[in-house]
UniProtKB/Swiss-Prot annotation:
Name the UniProt record assigns to this protein: Transmembrane protein 14DP
Subcellular location: Membrane
Organism domain of life: Eukaryota
Source species: Homo sapiens
PANTHER family: TRANSMEMBRANE PROTEIN 14, 15 (PTHR12668), TRANSMEMBRANE PROTEIN 14DP (PTHR12668:SF56)
InterPro entries documented for this protein: TMEM14 (IPR005349), TMEM14_sf (IPR044890)
Entry annotated with the keyword Transmembrane: yes
Family: Belongs to the TMEM14 family.
One GO term of the biological process aspect: regulation of heme biosynthetic process
TM region positions: 8-28, 36-56, 63-80, 83-103
Length: 114
């Protein structure tokens, strides 16, 4: 059996990285602007993504979870905010990361359709 050219990174590691990015984005948003909704959204969505990544770690076939729902929801919310404010940083960065995470989870869903 041939080894893949590039070893595949398990999806849950991307999920944990995405979780850290969302939580840190909420904290940075709170520190820069002093707005509690930034902190609350970062902690809420980061926690949900963390639960999803942990569930995916426990069972790699479990992709219909908090990680998929969180990333898709966050794409919409942060994408609209980025469009409204016309800035890439920081909401556009989070929207882009959420879009990549949603795409990666979507591909995994298509690959493991049971």
């Amino acid at each position: 059996m041939e080894k893949p050219l590039f070893p595949l990174v398990p999806l849950h590691w991307f999920g944990f990285g995405y979780t850290a990015l969302v939580v840190s984005g909420g904290i940075v948003g709170y520190v820069k602007t002093g707005r509690a909704p930034s902190l609350a959204a970062g902690l809420l969505f980061g926690s949900l993504a963390g639960v999803g990544a942990y569930q995916l770690y426990q069972d790699p076939r479990n992709v219909w979870d908090f990680l998929a729902a969180t990333s898709v929801t966050f794409v919409g919310i942060m994408g609209m905010r980025s469009y409204y404010y016309g800035k890439f940083m920081p909401v556009g960065l989070i929207a882009g990361a959420s879009l990549l995470m949603a795409a990666k989870v979507g591909v995994r869903m298509l690959m493991t359709s049971d």
